[in-house]
Regions:
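A surface/extracellular/periplasmic glyco- and lipid-processing/surface-interacting theme
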Residues: 2-49, 54-314
Length: 314
């Protein structure tokens, strides 16, 4: 039975306030650069992405539904078009600081895509939603931040709807983004027998050699704790380490676009491989996505959609 005034989040299946149910999330672009740490707003993350960009670096995107009470978010960095395609399935308000115009202009300036762009100009207005902080003399690209108050004013000025939009999201807004099990009934992956292999220490340095991301599973709270550069990745305000109930890995086709090293990833596809990691185990999956606003679906080797555990997903 639901606690009074609470409903299940479409993104995590956790209990949230009723007034958050229809609220559009933010999609916030965070850097991975060590010089840009610490970062702020992590505690509100529901779903977190890391995808490569040029020069072997990667970038992070946070999907956060409960975002209206944050005094500091960021630092904020530029976006790539494949992050936009990953974000659209949440009907978000996208928060970023520019991007390579030749590759992101077409998607960011589409009439259905709503973004708040710290650089302003042809990729979208800033709506005066950003500020600079630089107490330790870091490079300027690591000094741009925003906060909830400024974002709310920006949305009002821009005319961005704060609740899910019926014209693009009516088919999805009242459905769970993933298929979830209840928190009291964990999906241990034991039903897959030998196909579920142990996965308590995860090392993604081969895929992301710059920040060397790792995860350590803690059986006591069923969470995978994330580290980068050999240190816990923490929220700059609370000091809480990023941790996730579910880790999803997607493999996909990519190519190098030009001499600057800009990448392209195929974000709409069928039957590409991946991995689902939870409860200290891992199974092979395939994934598919066939529309901008439709969710990415993940299937086990029996062809059944996988069931995620209640909580945050990386």
């Amino acid at each position: 039975e639901a606690p009074e005034g609470k409903v299940r989040s479409q993104l995590t299946n956790e209990w949230i306030d009723e007034d958050l149910y229809d609220q559009r999330p933010l999609a916030v672009m965070y850097p991975i650069n060590k010089e840009g740490m610490p970062q702020y707003g992590y505690d509100k993350i529901d779903i977190f992405y890391e995808i490569l960009e040029e020069d072997g670096m990667s970038r992070q995107m946070a999907i956060m539904k409960d975002w209206k009470d944050l005094d500091k978010i960021g630092n904020i960095r530029s976006i790539r078009d494949y992050f936009v395609y990953a974000a659209l399935e949440y009907d978000p308000i996208i928060v970023h600081f520019g991007g390579p115009v030749v590759y992101v202009k077409d998607i960011l300036t589409r009439s259905d895509v709503q973004n708040i762009n710290g650089v302003g100009g042809e990729l979208g207005d800033s709506y005066d939603a950003f500020f600079r902080e630089n107490p330790d003399g870091r490079a300027s690209e690591h000094t741009a931040y925003t906060k909830s108050e400024l974002l709310l004013k920006a949305c009002d000025t821009a005319g961005f709807q704060l609740n899910y939009r019926d014209d693009v999201f009516a088919d999805y807004k009242d459905k769970s983004h993933y298929q979830f099990t209840e928190a009291s009934n964990k999906n241990t992956l034991e039903q897959y027998g030998d196909k579920a292999v142990p996965a308590e220490s995860l090392d993604f340095s081969a895929a992301y050699p710059h920040d060397i991301p790792t995860f350590e599973y803690h059986a006591d709270d069923h969470l995978y704790y994330r580290s980068i550069y050999g240190e816990p990745q923490k929220d700059g305000t609370t000091g809480t380490q990023l941790a996730f109930e579910n880790v999803l890995v997607q493999w996909t086709y990519y190519e190098v676009r030009d001499d600057n090293g800009y990448l392209a990833f195929r974000m709409h596809d069928k039957t590409h491989d991946g991995m689902f990691i939870t409860e200290g185990k891992m199974i092979h999956v395939t994934w598919e996505k066939d529309s901008d606003y439709g969710p990415t679906r993940y299937y086990d080797d029996n062809g059944d959609e996988i069931t995620l555990n209640t909580g945050k997903t990386m």
